């Protein structure tokens, strides 16, 4: 929804109604509560949810004040929308198929940093399913060996001596 003025505080009811109508037509309005068409003060038809807890006056007042109901969106609808797709991140409910790249040498464009080249889609892309919730941040104190950023096995020193020895 676009606004014509930057200092305009709220959206017009027409634009909000067309947005809600678009959501309903797209089939993503996932509330199980029966809906009823009512008229606001301006005579514009809006959708009001009827529940046993709230009277009709409260629901129509909320809509006229600009409160929006919570909308649950389908994952397939997000995949169809171009603005939600990213070359680096894929939203998925499944676990990742492969681990993320460990170092920059896997990227073909990083090998020659001195020349400026245009990016092409033919290069190896790391778009895939990466987990963003499985990492754990804590100090590891019982490691004796590790893998450095170049992939070489190294020994972890328990104590570092500085100065003349």
Swiss-Prot record:
Keywords: Cleavage on pair of basic residues, Glycoprotein, Growth factor, Secreted, Signal. Residues 1-3 form the signal peptide. SUPFAM superfamilies: Cystine-knot cytokines (SSF57501). The keyword Glycoprotein applies. GO terms for cellular component: axon; dendrite; extracellular space; synaptic vesicle. One of its GO terms (molecular function) is nerve growth factor receptor binding. Glycans are attached at residue 112. It is found in: Secreted. GO terms for biological process: cell surface receptor protein tyrosine kinase signaling pathway; modulation of chemical synaptic transmission; negative regulation of neuron apoptotic process; nerve development; nerve growth factor signaling pathway; neuron projection morphogenesis. InterPro entries: Cystine-knot_cytokine (IPR029034), Nerve_growth_factor-like (IPR020408), Nerve_growth_factor-rel (IPR002072), Neurotrophin-3 (IPR015578), NTF3_N (IPR045815). Pfam families: NGF, NTF3_N. The keyword Oxidoreductase does not apply. Belongs to the NGF-beta family. Seems to promote the survival of visceral and proprioceptive sensory neurons. PANTHER family: NERVE GROWTH FACTOR NGF -RELATED, NEUROTROPHIN-3. This is Neurotrophin-3. It comes from Anilius scytale.
